[in-house]
Design a protein with these regions (language model features):
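UBL (ubiquitin/ubiquitin-like) substrate-recognition surfaces
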Residues: 1-284
Length: 284
């Protein structure tokens, strides 16, 4: 990583011209442009792989060309061509919110572009090696290769893994625990590329604490858990945690309510001291 960082020092200070209301796209592209491992991987992909006539790969190629231009020298670029490619891809994927020049949410666009990159790269020749490296890393962290989590991964990622999962994949676990016996009644894993966080505080740390706080499901709260095995309602504790954190942790702050009103509060955080350890199973 240090070698890669050295190659990028004092470069990539390139601005993208706003074409209509594309500022949300430009900010998203700047973020993706600075994920160095990803762009190194994409460049290597196009230098080694036999390319298929696939719309996702064509989109990725257009991004690779724009990224190279952005890092060739520090300048201002008008990304007309790539905006056109985005609009065409949005129509093909029936995602019309990105098919025009209207203002949209940047996090939705980040997810849109990550999904396209994933679809383009899941057929790369080194995918099996990437996935095995991920499994090896899990084992190094003390997660058994025979665990329920690894079985979940192998099922979910069968023919569906890419470098995007290595870099951005967030794996979470939900446990339902009997309040009286502390017995785990059920467990469920899930994964995604970004975590939706409700704006319950002006502090990101507090928002995370509330998001991952235990939830009491009991008679008093009128939300008891129904145990299918014993055919009865029980008082339980619902525990939600990050089972394995990603290299790049994307948080979406849910600013819009059901009445389409935006929460404009400023959220405070220290980029150098955000600690996910209290919310991660493997670090508890």
């Amino acid at each position: 990583m240090n070698d890669i960082m050295g190659e990028y020092t004092n470069k990539g200070l390139t601005g993208l011209t706003n074409l209509g209301n594309t500022c949300y796209i430009n900010s998203s592209l700047q973020i993706m442009s600075h994920v160095y491992e990803l762009n190194e991987y994409i460049t290597h992909f196009f230098s080694k792989e036999h390319q298929k006539n696939d719309t996702n790969i064509i989109f990725l190629k257009e991004w690779n060309d724009l990224h190279k231009l952005m890092w060739s020298k520090n300048c201002i670029i008008s990304p007309n061509r790539f905006i056109g490619v985005i609009q065409k891809m949005a129509k093909q994927k029936q995602n019309d919110i990105f098919a025009g020049f209207h203002q949209n949410d940047s996090t939705e666009f980040v997810y849109f572009i990550i999904s396209i990159f994933h679809d383009a790269l899941k057929g790369a020749s080194d995918v099996d090696t990437l996935f095995q490296c991920q499994l090896n890393d899990f084992e190094h962290q003390g997660i058994s290769s025979k665990s329920d989590f690894v079985r979940y991964l192998k099922t979910y990622h069968k023919n569906n893994y890419s470098i995007m999962d290595t870099l951005f994949g967030i794996y979470c676990k939900m446990d339902i625990v009997d309040s009286s016996s502390s017995k785990v009644l059920s467990s469920k894993y899930e994964n995604f590329y970004m975590l939706d966080i409700a704006l319950t505080s002006t502090s990101l740390d507090e928002c995370l604490k509330i998001h991952f706080a235990n939830e009491l499901m009991n008679k008093e709260n009128d939300n008891q858990y129904y145990d299918d095995k014993e055919k009865c309602y029980k008082d339980v504790i619902k525990k939600y945690s990050i089972y394995y954190p990603p290299r790049y942790f994307i948080v979406q702050l849910k600013r819009w309510n059901h009445n389409l009103r935006k929460n404009q509060r400023i959220i405070h955080y220290d980029i150098n001291s955000i600690d996910l350890n209290p919310f991660c199973v493997i670090f508890k």
